[in-house]
Amino acid sequence: MYIVMITPECAPIAKVGGLGDVVQGLSNELSIRGNTVELILPKYDCMRYERIWGLEKTHNNLWVPYHDQWIPCDVYFGFAEGLKCFFIEPHNGFFQRGTYYGQPDDPQRFAFFCKAALEFMLRSNKYPEIIHCHDWQTGLVPVLLFEQYKYLGMTHPRVCYTLHNMRHQGVTGGHILQQVGLDPAAYMTPERLLDHTYPHGVNLMKGGIVFSNFITTVSPRYLDEIRYTDQGYGLQHTLHEHSQKLGGILNGVDYKVWNPDIDPYIAARYNLKTLDKKYENKTALRHRLWLRDEYKPIVGVISRLDPQKGVELIRHALFYCLANGCQFVLLGASASNSINADFWYLKQYLNDDPDCHLEIGYDEDLAHQIYAGADMLIVPSIYEPCGLTQMIAMKYGTVPIVRHVGGLADTVFDANYAHKPYHERNGFVFHDFNHEGIEAALHRAIGLWYEYPQYFRELMENGMRYDFSWNHPGQHYLNIYHHIQEI
């Protein structure tokens, strides 16, 4: 099958969050299964070009109709982690901003990218069976495909559209439709792209939902949450109207990258049969971070310091752990200056504490070493479409402590959860987003570590037995692709 991913991100070359990991992991899995997979991305000036092999310009005469003019573009080709990638570089500087997102004209930038991606496919005679789009940034692709490019000969492709985070929907003014050649009066209706909140607004994510052949979310639980709770951020009715083409598929983890048995970044490699070597990594982590060697559990956090990720509870857990016989390690940073400043203050305040280390930023080596050396990992999110950290932690025998939301609820089952056999229980879960909730979960986890280490080890082993690879999600997506081909 010939599949084209149109995406704003792909790890490791252009990654802001989990979306980039998903695109890379799923594309690799589909390629391994014998499919032809190509990716189309913007050519950001801030990409990690050192991770792109064989980058060369392949087209320098792609003219894209946009806003009553023709914008010239160059197209480059290269390999990223073995994946075939095309990068579109418009001459108007849309993607020469030193950042991926966060610009006032982001809707215009990515509306243009949607148009340019389809124009490139048309002009280069690419007719895939499946176009797979991701989040609001590519929401206009199915709209333009079925309302414009179908009549130019692109009648074959079917579109799968994945919702990674409903919090960001690409809401903008109606003028954007005119800029890409669509009549605002025809598309700014409640059944099409009209936003639910702003009476004169266009919702790009809604366009993707309405016009795609199938929509997926990144976990089954998140699908329920966005349909039936305020996590749909106003699109609940639209999702209900299109419920016949909705499905939730749990993301996978790339075990070529996140696997303690082959991990080049950790002090001692190990697997389920050699789990005792994990403690060598605990010692190495302490030495790297200048933590004292004591008989204490290490509680880790690897996270964006974003309100969604539960920074308030992370901060509270830090002091609770230090007061209750634990060491605490954090790796993370925030796009918010105030949150960063808060954690920098905490870092300075706790600088002389031999049981605590806060690393403000992101360090790939250290992330691997925390997964390998920590005993527990906290993920106290307000909402979590899927979450990868808890699944990675389990592969490393690190017991997750999570809030019961989204993909966390689909992957972590409490040590006391009576509806699961004991060998399927793999962590600690709390429900209420408050201090009492996370304290109760930490109290149980810390108590088990100290008082019943043999039972704690069973949780570690249970987690390591779970298969969160891309094998099952890859097959689910192929089933969807085959299904929508018949439409």
Curated annotation (Swiss-Prot):
A GO term, aspect molecular function: alpha-1,4-glucan glucosyltransferase (ADP-glucose donor) activity
InterPro entries per UniProt: Glyco_trans_1, GS/SS, Starch_synth_cat_dom
Pathway as given in its UniProt record: Glycan biosynthesis; glycogen biosynthesis
Swiss-Prot/TrEMBL GO biological process terms: glycogen biosynthetic process
Binding site for ADP-alpha-D-glucose: 15
EC nos: 2.4.1.21
Name of one Pfam family that matches: Glycos_transf_1
UniProt keyword terms in alphabetical order: Glycogen biosynthesis, Glycosyltransferase, Transferase
SUPFAM superfamilies: UDP-Glycosyltransferase/glycogen phosphorylase
Reaction catalyzed: [(1->4)-alpha-D-glucosyl](n) + ADP-alpha-D-glucose = [(1->4)-alpha-D-glucosyl](n+1) + ADP + H(+)
Enzyme kind, highest EC tier: transferase
Domain of life from the UniProt record: Bacteria
Similarity-based family: Belongs to the glycosyltransferase 1 family. Bacterial/plant glycogen synthase subfamily.
Cited function: Synthesizes alpha-1,4-glucan chains using ADP-glucose.
Protein name: Glycogen synthase 1
Species of the source: Nitrosococcus oceani (strain ATCC 19707 / BCRC 17464 / JCM 30415 / NCIMB 11848 / C-107)
Lineage: Bacteria, Pseudomonadati, Pseudomonadota, Gammaproteobacteria, Chromatiales
Gene: glgA1
